[in-house]
């Protein structure tokens, strides 16, 4: 009796099945055959995979292992998990996705670690690194050119959905006492041969008044936003808007309380609109203000004060908290800015629902709560700064 031949899976069905698989599995399956490799590298497949991934975003936690005298000992760990359930209290298991050697981050204007369209961008003063946890591609951008000392440097990444283009934006602001701050704007287009990557001056923005950038950046629908004071001496608050596609810079007038220094005001997207969460660093963490840009043309803002019972923080060592973003349930996420130093403690994040005013706590299991892991990588011997991206979308794209 002849063995019946197994029918081949139709090509379209093969493609459909592959789009449903995890990104890491696809990276392994490229070695199965030339056909599968060509499918996975096809731009149409990459776009389809990203579209499906956007319906199931992942929760990303990145943290460094403290301060070491040698760069060889420094590490940046990137953990991820599927989105947590909408419950009053729960725990979520996280998995280590990627480890980036010789890289660390800190909590200041010159350092940041954020997710933009599937890529994690990490900046630390003159060094700017971009990685894809799914493909494990790591790109170290050229060091920023020397400026006139003293100055402050910061970098971020923006994405233009029209041209499907990533660009890095660098700000070099002068820090001369008793003078208005001048800012040099540099751009690097993430396209082509990486050996030819270079920073270039933004053209056509000669009429920009002096200003001092004072907040972290956020990219929403092709525009990078950040808070600033202009002119520096009178400290008028504005939101600076950098259009990634046109590379034009404009200002949005804001109430003074919308923009504060560094982590005291955090910009984010709230229900499709630009928002700023503002807290008072000199008081106990029981209230914060949510400012929302309701009409960008009229430059009109709304304000809502949110209250949190102090008993919520019983499981947290200190009140040094940050606001990483908002989830699909409309909950504002609150999280510690660093890991527990020398003590093996659980890592908790909190969710505050603006409309119902309810707050819930979620324990993230696996975030450096293993003694062997901490000892192996030196966690606890220095400040371990934490950055969270709650809406990370996996991509198999390479830059």
UniProtKB/Swiss-Prot annotation:
GO terms for cellular component: cytoplasm. InterPro entries: F-box-assoc_dom_typ3, F-box-assoc_interact_dom, F-box-like_dom_sf, F-box_dom. It holds the Pfam family F-box. Residues 3-49 form the F-box domain. SMART domains: FBOX. NCBIfam families: F_box_assoc_1. This is F-box protein At1g30790.
């Amino acid at each position: 009796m002849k063995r019946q031949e197994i029918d081949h899976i139709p090509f379209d069905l093969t493609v459909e099945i592959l789009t449903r698989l995890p990104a890491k599995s696809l990276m392994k399956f490229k070695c199965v055959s030339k056909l599968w490799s060509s499918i996975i590298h096809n731009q149409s497949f990459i776009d389809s995979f990203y579209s499906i991934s956007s319906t199931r975003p992942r929760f990303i936690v990145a943290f460094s292992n403290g301060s070491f005298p040698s760069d060889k000992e420094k590490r940046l760990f990137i953990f991820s998990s599927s989105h947590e359930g909408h419950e009053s209290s729960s725990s979520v298991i996280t998995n280590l996705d990627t480890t980036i050697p010789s890289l660390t981050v800190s909590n200041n204007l010159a350092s940041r670690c954020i997710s933009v369209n599937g890529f994690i961008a990490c900046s630390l003063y003159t060094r700017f690194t971009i990685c894809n946890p799914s493909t494990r591609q790591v790109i170290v951008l050229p060091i920023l050119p020397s400026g006139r000392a003293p100055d402050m440097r910061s970098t971020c990444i923006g994405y233009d959905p029209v041209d499907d283009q990533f660009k890095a934006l660098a700000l070099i602001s002068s820090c001369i006492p008793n003078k208005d701050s001048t800012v040099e704007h540099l751009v690097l287009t993430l396209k082509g041969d990486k050996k030819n990557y270079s920073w270039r001056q933004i053209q056509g923005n000669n009429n920009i008044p002096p200003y001092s950038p004072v907040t972290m950046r956020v990219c929403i629908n092709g525009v990078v936003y950040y808070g600033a004071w202009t002119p520096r001496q009178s400290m008028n608050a504005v939101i600076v808007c950098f259009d990634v596609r046109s590379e034009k810079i404009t200002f949005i007038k804001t109430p003074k309380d919308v923009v504060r220094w560094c982590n005291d005001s955090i910009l984010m997207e709230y229900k499709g609109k630009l928002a700023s969460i503002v807290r008072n660093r000199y008081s106990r963490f029981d209230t914060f203000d949510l400012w929302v840009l309701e009409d960008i043309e009229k430059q009109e803002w709304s304000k809502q004060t949110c209250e949190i019972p102090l008993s919520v923080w019983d499981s947290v060592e200190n009140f040094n908290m940050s606001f990483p973003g908002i989830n699909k349930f409309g909950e504002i996420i609150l999280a510690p800015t660093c890991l527990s130093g020398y003590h093996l403690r659980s890592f908790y994040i909190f969710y505050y629902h603006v409309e119902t005013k309810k707050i819930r706590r979620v324990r993230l299991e696996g975030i450096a709560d293993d003694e062997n892991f901490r000892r192996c990588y030196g966690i606890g011997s220095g400040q371990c700064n934490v950055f969270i991206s709650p809406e990370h979308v996996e991509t198999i794209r390479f830059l």
